[in-house]
Amino acid sequence: TPAEVRLKKGDNELRVVFESQAMGDGQFRLQWSGAGFGFEPIAPERLSFAADDAELAQAHRLQQGQHLFAERRCARCHDYALSPRIGESAYGELDQSAPDLRTMGARVHVPWLAAWLREPHTIRPDATMPEFELTDAECDDVAAWLGSLGAPPPAPTFVAEDAAKGRVLFRQLGCVACHQFGEAMAAEPALAARIAIAHVPQKWHASALVAYLRDPRAHHRDVRMPDLRVSATEAHQLAAFLLGGTSAVLPPSRGDAERGRRIAQQQRCGICHDLDLPLDDRPFRRLQNLNPERGCLAEKPHDHDAPNHHLSDEQRASLRAFLAHATTAPFRRAPLDYAQRHLQAQRCTACHGFDGVPSTWARWVAVAGAKEPLPKDQDPVAQGVPALTWVGAKLQPSWLLRFVAGEQASPRPWLTARMPAFARHGGPIVTGL
C-alpha cells in the first residue's frame, strides 16, 4: 500500500513490511521528493542497513549456496531425477557447461594439462574445476590422452612491435581490470583478486590463443571470459604480448594415452565435459539422501572418495543450507537475484563502478598512474565508462539487452574502452537490473 513519511534532519529509520510472491521477483519503489525536485529514486549512497541482521545473513548464505550449486554443477552428478530438468532451470543456470575437451590437444600444451589436473587451484584459486585424487602418473596419463585429441595448426609469426601494440591493447580494452600480468601490484584486495595469467605461455599453443581471443565461447559456451570482439590483428597482437611473458618451464609429461582414456572414463569426466567417451551409469547419491558432512562437502573430501572443490568453511555452510531448496529454487525465475549473483561472477564491477564503489579498473589506474602517467585512452574514468547504479532505471531494457549481447553498436564509437558481449548471461542480468 503506498504510504508517505516526512523525513527529519539527520538519519531516519524506515521500516517496510513486504510479503513477496511465491514465484518471480517481488518489488516496490522507494522514492523521495523535496524543495526543488519531484519524486525520484533515493540514491543508494543515502541508504544503509544493519549488516549483522540474522535474517539478511541467512538470505545471503542461501544466495551464495544457490550460486555455488550451479557453478560447481552439483546437479549433473547428484540427482538423476533432476538431471532431465536441468535445461528447464531458470535461465538454464543448472545447465552451465564445462569446456569441450574433444580437441584439447590442438589448444593446450600437455605439461600444463598435467599440472592443472594435479592442482587446478594452485594455478587458479577461484577455479571451478575440482581436484581429483589422482597420482602424478595418472595425471600424466590423462594429460597424454587429452593431448592426443587434435594437433595444433602452425604457429603464427610474431614481430617485436606486435607485443608492444598488444601491451597497449591490454590496457586500452580493460584487460587489466580482470587480470594480473607482468606486475607486482597486489596490496589492495580488489587488485589482488584479479586472475593471474602468467601461466599463459605454459598453457596455450600460439595459434589456439589467437583463436580463443577472437571467440572465447567457441569451445566453452559458459566461459567467464567475455567476448571483446577483437579483430584478427588485435587478437594477434594481444597473443604476442601474452606469450612474451616469463613463466617457469614445466617439466615434461610422459604419460600413457590409453591408460589416460580409461582413467577419464572411470572418473566420469564426460558428465561435465564434452568427450567422446561412454558414460558410466553408476548412480550418484540423490540430493535428498546426501549427508552434508560427507562427500564433496566434507572437510577432507578425498577421505570419502569425492573430488575436492577446495571450498572454504563459509562456502560449505552455504551449500549445506541450500541443499534443502536445491530441487525447487533453481527453477524459480528471479532476475534480480540472478543479477545480484552474476554481477560478481561475470566481473561486471571490474570495469563499472556500482553503488558508489569504484571499479577495479579505476583502482588499478589510480595505483599504476602514480608510478607511470597513463594516456586518456587507458583511463576508464577519463573516458567516462558509466557506473551501473540505477542503469535499469535510466536505459530502455530492449536497447540494453541488444547492447550487452553485442548486437547493438556502441553509441560512443570514438572510445577505446569497449563493451564486451555477454550473449549467454547478459539477458537475465539486464532483466534484473
Predicted features, each with a name:
Residues K8-E13, F18-G24, P99, L134, ...:
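Repeat-solenoid scaffold signature
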Residues F18-S20, G34, A81, G150, ...:
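Surface-exposed loop/turn motifs at beta-strand-loop junctions within extracellular Ig-like
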Residues R85-A151, A186-S247, L279-F331, S359-L433:
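Extracytoplasmic electron-transfer domains, predominantly the class I c-type cytochrome c fold
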